[in-house]
């Protein structure tokens, strides 16, 4: 299908988003064209503002507009427990269940040799620095229950074994191959309750 160049550019831009193929991108592009100009400008401004004004917490790696993030800055949280997750969206999913009151560490990915991603390519070195603090008693590995998530959890657990820090893995009330962000609060809560030592 041949579209005018501005529509083609818009479709190509939408296709850069995960899970958006050519048909969905075209549908979104035509939806945007039907929007009021003020709404389109607000949408574009929201995209630019998010990109410019958000960064990663220097402590945990969670996405934030303040450094440290609101979780790391909260003095009422249990600083003896760190929950290790893959992405910021996993922190948001965990926070929805309101059962976990410790801190987080965001890896920004998983070990994936097939994709050329090793331990040094994700946020593991910063985790090791954080664990030099004598107040850390437990690390909960809450990576996704897929091949890469399991490999990353196993790597971290082996790395931490000599430290004497208790290392646990969330239970698999989550489907194998699933993502934390799609789990409901009850399932996540049960997975945290049923975590096991690794």
From Swiss-Prot:
Keyword annotations of the record: DNA damage, DNA recombination, DNA repair, Metal-binding, Zinc, Zinc-finger
Zinc fingers typed C4-type, residue spans: 57-72
Superkingdom as given in the UniProt entry: Bacteria
Occurrences of domain Toprim (ranges): 80-175
GO biological process: double-strand break repair; recombinational repair
Pfam families: RecR_C (PF21175), RecR_HhH (PF21176), RecR_ZnF (PF02132), Toprim_4 (PF13662)
Gene Ontology terms for molecular function: DNA binding; zinc ion binding
Record-given protein name: Recombination protein RecR
Gene: recR
């Amino acid at each position: 299908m041949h579209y005018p160049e501005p529509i083609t550019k818009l479709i190509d831009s939408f296709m850069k988003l995960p899970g958006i193929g050519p048909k969905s991108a075209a549908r979104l592009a035509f939806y945007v064209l039907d929007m009021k100009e003020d709404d389109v400008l607000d949408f574009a401004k929201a995209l630019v503002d998010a990109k410019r004004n958000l960064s990663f917490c220097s402590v945990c790696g969670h996405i934030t507009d303040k450094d440290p993030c609101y979780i790391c800055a909260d003095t009422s949280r249990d600083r003896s427990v760190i929950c290790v997750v893959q992405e910021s969206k996993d922190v948001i999913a965990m926070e929805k269940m309101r059962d976990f009151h410790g801190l987080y560490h965001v890896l920004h990915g998983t070990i994936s040799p097939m994709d050329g991603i090793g331990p040094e390519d994700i946020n593991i070195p910063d985790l090791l620095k954080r664990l030099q603090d004598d107040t850390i008693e437990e690390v909960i590995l809450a990576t996704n229950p897929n091949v890469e998530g399991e490999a990353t959890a196993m790597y971290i657990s082996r790395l931490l074994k000599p430290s004497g820090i208790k290392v646990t893995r969330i239970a698999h009330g989550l489907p194998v191959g699933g993502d934390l962000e799609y789990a409901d609060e009850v399932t996540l809560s049960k997975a945290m309750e049923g975590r096991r030592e690794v």
